[in-house]
Every structure is written in C-alpha cells, then in structure tokens.
Amino acid sequence: IMCTEAKARAFRPSDAELEGDTDAATKYVGVSKKYEATFPNIEMNTVPHLKLVQFIESAIRESEPDIVITHHPADTNNDHLQTSMACQEAIRLFQRQPTVKPVKEFWYMEVPSCSEWAINDAMNLFRPNCYVEVGQNGIQAKCKALSMYRGVMRPYPHPRSVEYITGLAAMRGSQWGCNYAEAFQVVLRRY
C-alpha cells in the first residue's frame, strides 16, 4: 500500500515526486510489479476497513504470493495497525474464493522508528522468530533504496538513519550467526 498524502512529514514531496521516488526505489531493489492505492497517511483509520481488505485481496489474487509480509500490529503508527489488520483478513481470501491460491506464510516485519516503541502491548510485542541473511551488500542496498524517498532518512541516532539500520541488521545477524540479517515474526505457516 502506498500513501500519497504524507501530511505529517517535515518535508512533503509532491505526489509526482513521491511517485518518482517509489518508482526509483522499487526499480533499484528489483521489484517488477507494485500495487498502489491512495489511502490518506496518518488517517487510514478513516478509510472503511473493507476497502483496505479488498485492495490487498486484489493484489493477492493477481500476484499469488507464497508469503505476505506486513507491519506488526503493535507498531506505534496507526496506519501500520490498520494495514496489519486488513492483511490478516485478506490472507483468508482463499476461504471465501476457493479458486484463489492460499498464502503459505504470513510474516510481520520490523520497522525502525515504529516497532521498537511497542507501546500497544495489548497486541503483544514484535518477537522475531525468522531471520533472513541479507549480507553487507543487502543492507547497503536497503539504505540506498530508503534514501531514494525524500525526507525519510534522518541523521543518527534516529532509527531511520544508515547507522541505526546497519547496526540493527548487524545485531539481528549476530543473533542468527551471520553478519547482517533482517528479522521477522512468522505468525502463520501452512504446508
């Protein structure tokens, strides 16, 4: 889901600039197909939940993913909660439409500047149980792709700084016995 109304950012790029930033970042990391919708940033709780679910279901129907990765519902950003809850419903699409390929795995991702706050402990905390080795080149590519979004990266010690993101990947890697890794929480696995 891409939000084009970034009202809360200190620097607000135009819609055309944001579209260009998204295109550049997705191309850089090798994404061949992106699914876009215009939902209001920081106000996704004002969008009918069904619209979010249907948008995600449409992407699932078209792309037939094995894995869906979304935000942890305890992230401090309410938009992340709305997205997570909509994904939780959308991955059950195969139960309502038997011709749809079932999703095999459902993961929560770690989002620097959101997941570590975990103020909403009623939703439990982010508990990584899956680590994907990304290597130094992978983490450098992630930082470069993030820097393609105007106004997203910040100076250290902000969690969206190159130093923090690299340090987090090094810590997650050391937890798993490699140099750099991304951590996820697998909440559903179907085989």
Question: Where are these predicted regions, by residue range?
Answer:
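Conserved SAM-binding loop
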Residues: 22-25
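A charged helix-plus-loop insertion that forms the helical arch/lid used to bind
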Residues: 14-19
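A conserved beta-strand->alpha-helix junction
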Residues: 1-2, 27-40
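Metal-dependent de-N-acetylase/amidase catalytic core
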Residues: 12-13, 42, 46-191
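ATP-dependent adenylation/pyrophosphate-handling site
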Residues: 1-13
